[in-house]
Design a protein with these regions (language model features):
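Conserved acetyl-CoA-binding loop of GNAT-fold acetyltransferases
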Residues: 109-118
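Short amphipathic alpha-helix that is part of the acyltransferase structural core
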Residues: 1-50, 58-60, 64, 119, ...
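Low-complexity, intrinsically disordered Gly/Pro/Thr-rich segments
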Residues: 146-152
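Conserved acetyl-CoA-binding loop-helix of GNAT-fold acetyltransferases
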Residues: 65, 70, 76-89
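Short acidic/polar capping segments at secondary-structure boundaries
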Residues: 101-104, 113-114
Length: 167
């Protein structure tokens, strides 16, 4: 089985939105997947989708972390912590994600992320995404006005405008 096929299976076992969304996600962003393998098997993966943080009119490189998952048999072995440590090393990049539940926030905090408020309202910090991201986001429900966001990197903010969540 190819790496892409393994990633698709792992993703669908953990998340699997709709067939249309899943296909578009992998067609548009497969090249942005970070993978940790045990032998030839994908044990952990996530999408690291490039975008920009616009902070007080300054454009900063950012990566949206999406669909963080580890295969059941490899959970609680520190693999995702290792994958994060190995792949989130650019000190000029801001990394951010929308946690799938309150239960995973402690893990992200241990990985260096800070919880802030995500909003659809205007703020001095806004995420700018490319057209492919906008197409994919159009297939998703929009979040409520405020929701948790986790952020890591050199950006001292407590609110982040992010209209194009993938959920």
């Amino acid at each position: 089985m190819t790496t892409k096929e393994q990633c698709e299976m792992l993703y669908k076992s953990a998340f699997g939105e709709s067939p249309e969304f899943d296909k578009m996600l992998f067609d548009l962003f497969f090249e942005n997947i970070e993978v940790l393998k045990i032998g030839d098997e994908v044990a952990a993966m996530y999408f690291k989708i490039p975008c920009f943080l616009i902070l007080d009119n300054t454009r900063i490189k950012a990566d949206y972390i999406y669909a963080v998952t580890t295969a059941d048999k490899y959970r609680r072995k520190g693999l995702m912590s290792k994958l994060f440590a190995d792949t989130q090393t650019d000190t000029d990049t801001v990394y951010f994600l929308k946690p799938s539940s309150e239960g995973v926030i402690a893990f992200y905090e241990q990985a260096g992320f800070k919880k802030i408020i995500g909003t659809r309202a205007q703020s001095n910090a806004t995420i700018e995404v490319n057209d492919n991201f906008k197409k994919l986001s159009a297939l998703c429900d929009k979040p409520q006005n405020e929701y948790p966001i986790m952020i890591k990197g050199n950006a001292d903010i407590d609110r982040l405008t992010f209209e194009y969540t993938l959920e």
